[in-house]
Amino acid sequence: IAVRVDNSEQPNSRWYSGCGIYRNVWLTTVEPLYVDLWGTYVTTPEVSEQKATVSVSTTIKSEMTAEASVKIETIIRDGSQNSVSTQSTTQQFKPGDSNVIEQQLQIDNPVFWSVDNPHLYTVVTNLYADGKQTDSYETPLGVRTFEFDAEKGFFLNGESIKIKGVCMHHDLGALGASINTRALERQLEILREMGVNGIRTAHNPPAPELLQLCDKMGFIVQDETFDMWRKRKTTYDYSLYFNEWHERDLTDHILRDRNHPSIFSWSIGNEVMEQWTQADADTLDIMQANLLLNFTRDIDESEISDTLSVNSLLTIKLVNMVKELDPTRPVTAGNNETRTINHLLLSGALDIIGFNYHLNDYDNVKVEYPGKPFIASETTSALATRGYYRMPSDSAYIWPARWDMTFEDPSFSCSAYDNCHVPWGSTHEDTWRKVKENDYVSGLYIWTGFDYIGEPTPFNFPARSSYFGIIDLAGCLLYVSV
């Protein structure tokens, strides 16, 4: 097998995406009777302190040359690898069959998965053809209940908690974009020590290793698929491939990730241009795209019709695709257009209203989107350089004043007193106060947990990485983290 990777067409992202094959690739060999790729779907339709009903749906494929009697044995093991439930099903399989086997098991006195005690069960699926074992497949399971409530916020296992999350790009600072599980684990350890309990995967499906760590360490994940749909943000970005690939990519994303207990919501897009009716959005350069993303406030509302737009219909389509594959979790999107002219919000399809920034618009949610839970899907965008403090400490710096204004400062540094932020953002203190004091806000995902390579706001070259992180590229904490 030979794979050629070409990343020469630039820019294709608004941050550093990395080059080459930077995640693990697995070549799996199987017997003629096997569990299909991402072939299990494990849910817990009924959960109480006394018992948990576990529904296991398994897709099994046969490439055998003759019909066989197939035994499907499913075992649930607890965190100590003790068997706590088992069930077997027998069915005839013919050559070429692809069958879905449904089973229900019960766990007595289940240990709940939580932020403080992320207990993991393992669902083991064993296949036997005419008495000979042909496959063994493992699926993670976390027993928990959760709810996003429009009035009272987020509940996990009946307990009200605030999601105190951060957004994370996939690079690892000086290590680059290549996956390194221990480096990811170190990042999560630093975040957890700081009090973080949530991760938003900005703005693409994450490495599977990240989700495995979040399962094990107890993080509340918002799993995001797209940064753009049909309308582009950079010259060579995913919009070139959206029409051909979005159905396959979204399907694969949900199938791959839906068994992770750390995932509590899906996001189908981040600040996509389809929020607005902008005919020229396909011809924007990166500076104009950022301007439109963060400062669009002059749309003629008379252009909005009473019927659903193509962009609203596309929103409904994407949400329905997710729901068909995983009806157990809510779907949201990161919206930086908070008014009711937003085509994604007009669709009515989003289960959770997610606002990127616009702190002063939070209180409008209950009026403009009644009955919908709310989360601050992206917040703050404060700027800081470790060890650099500009006096006086109670002064405020908004850098730059607007995206369409040039900005220079010879220090190439931002004050770390939590008194410097971008014009569409806010300080950490102001943001957290708003979230903490309002029960209806389920939580927040701060931009960003760690600094990342690329998008060196507010400076241009020779700056080469962001200033947004609560933690810098080396993993050192800034003033705002303590």
Please report, for each region that a protein language model flagged, where it lies by residue.
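Short hydrophobic/aromatic-enriched beta-strand-loop microsegments
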Residues: 218-225, 351-357, 373-379
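The substrate-binding groove and active-site-proximal loops of carbohydrate-active enzymes
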Residues: 167-182, 190, 194-202, 227-245, ...
